[in-house]
């Protein structure tokens, strides 16, 4: 059976700047891929191509057996690909419940009765049910991050693209978020860009390293993080450091 996501020989450049240099990857449901690399490595550009924000110059993106390169960005959520951002973007004047309900209605395209039920289920799953009637703009940062995930889940996404979602949190909050993301693997495929290696290591089944738009490594987190090349280009440590 084909993988949920199949990216083949993806290429993108802006003049002399290469952001995707023949990138290929596959991802199945219930698998988390941690995506790391220095700033400018092409991580966000890869997400932008997966979500249709930018078009690749070449290569193929297949999702759930379908070539999605012609699917417009605003329709990718209906296909099943949703991105959660580093800086949460809730509708601040709406309640937490209304934010999630909106995602269920317009992201998933559910009818109102089903959307209402699904929104409550999602709030419970993400630990936000007790905040359902609170204005989203009044949430603390960790709960705004939870809401970002809740909206993605409510849209019935199959693939979650997490873009540095743990950024700005305390260590304790990071590990709370890790627990939630780990629980989401049971029903989703996840690609997670993050600069907190131990958080990724706690969730990811694989890690992929990008550098100047090229895939350098793809393998078990322990092997990738122990690589002398990764230690040098990503962590800024000498390749032979203990």
Label each PLM-derived region with a short phrase.
Residues 2-242:
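Glycine-rich phosphate-binding loops of nucleotide-dependent enzymes
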């Amino acid at each position: 059976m084909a993988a949920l996501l199949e990216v083949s020989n993806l290429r993108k450049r802006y003049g002399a700047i290469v952001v995707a240099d023949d990138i290929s990857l596959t991802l199945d449901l219930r698998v988390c891929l941690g995506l790391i690399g220095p700033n400018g490595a092409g991580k966000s550009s890869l997400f932008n191509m997966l979500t249709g924000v930018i078009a690749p110059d070449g290569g193929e993106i297949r999702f759930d057996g379908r070539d999605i390169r012609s699917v417009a960005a605003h329709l990718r959520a209906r296909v099943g690909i949703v991105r959660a951002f580093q800086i949460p973007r809730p509708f601040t004047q709406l309640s937490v419940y209304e934010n999630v309900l909106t995602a269920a209605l317009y992201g998933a395209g559910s009818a109102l009765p089903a959307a209402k039920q699904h929104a409550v289920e999602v709030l419970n799953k993400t630990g936000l049910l007790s905040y359902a009637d609170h204005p989203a703009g009044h949430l603390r940062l960790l709960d705004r991050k939870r809401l970002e995930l809740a909206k993605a889940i409510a849209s019935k996404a199959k693939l979650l693209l997490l873009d540095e979602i743990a950024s700005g949190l305390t260590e304790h909050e990071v590990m709370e978020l890790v627990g939630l993301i780990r629980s989401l693997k049971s029903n989703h495929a996840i690609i997670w860009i993050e600069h907190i290696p131990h958080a990724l290591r706690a969730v990811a089944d694989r890690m992929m390293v990008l550098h100047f738009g090229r895939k350098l490594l793809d393998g078990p987190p322990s092997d990738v993080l122990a690589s002398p090349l990764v230690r040098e280009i990503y962590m800024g440590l000498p390749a032979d450091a203990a």
